[in-house]
Amino acid sequence: MTEFLKLKKSNCKNCYKCIRNCPVKSIRFSAGQANIVGDECIICGQCFVVCPQNAKEIVSGVETVRVLLSGDAPVYASVAPSFIANYNGAGIESLQTALQALGFAGAEETAIGATHVKTEYERLLAEEGRDILISSCCYSINLLIQKYYPDLLPCLADVVSPMQAHCLDLKRRHPGAKTVFIGPCVAKKDEADHYQGIVDAVLTFEELSGWLTEAGIAIAPGPHAESDESRARLFPTTGGILKTMACAQPGYTYLALDGVESCKAALEDIRNGNLHRCFIEMSACIGSCVGGPVM
């Protein structure tokens, strides 16, 4: 996989905080430096959050997006609904105006894709014989299961993430367009890279804020318009997926878990046969996406 989290060796002061806080112990200390083991990393960004020396660096997508904007194809932004927590007082219309000033053709909330995803979850739960179903929205959780619980992959919903669902929808409605996801998550960069042709680039809120500041563009406060996808705006909060779903399957339990340790505990319970007939919403970040590493 492409490395989207890198170490600035000159900044590392050997404090071991990243090693102690990595939930899957994918950081090794060698030759006087902490090193991320890519094949074991789930890209949760916790090492980036806890590093006091700014020795962890997220690879920026700004130049990639600049290249897209310089081309002939229109570029549309899919904006994670957690932007409300990052850009206080701004609605999607205000954010779209700022993005259009950068050269984007338009911007929409990823909640449009989330609506499609929750419908697919409801359909899967209605299938006869369904036992455990785990949400597939959080790419770090998907990687956790793929790398550390591969025997539980049949439990992971075979449904694209809201990011992919929305960008596929944008490309269907705007043939030939390019798509850029903007959100609080570094793992989405790897997801976009892994599933080529759906999401053409990913920016974090931090990258977008820096770019707007550099360009002298301010996001004006504005109302948050109601839409058919308003309930799907709950997706980035803990339990948000469940709040959008019709949780009515008889005999089913619906759980919402956030934080890698809580999710690992549940996965161990599933592996040991202690959980049955459950839909489990899992998020790697405590607080779900609104607690993302790059808010």
Where are these regions (language model features)?
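Short, intrinsically disordered, charge-biased short linear motifs at domain edges
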Residues: 1-2, 8-9, 27, 37-38, ...
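Iron-sulfur cluster-binding cysteine motifs and their immediate structural context
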Residues: 4-9, 13-42, 46-62, 293-295
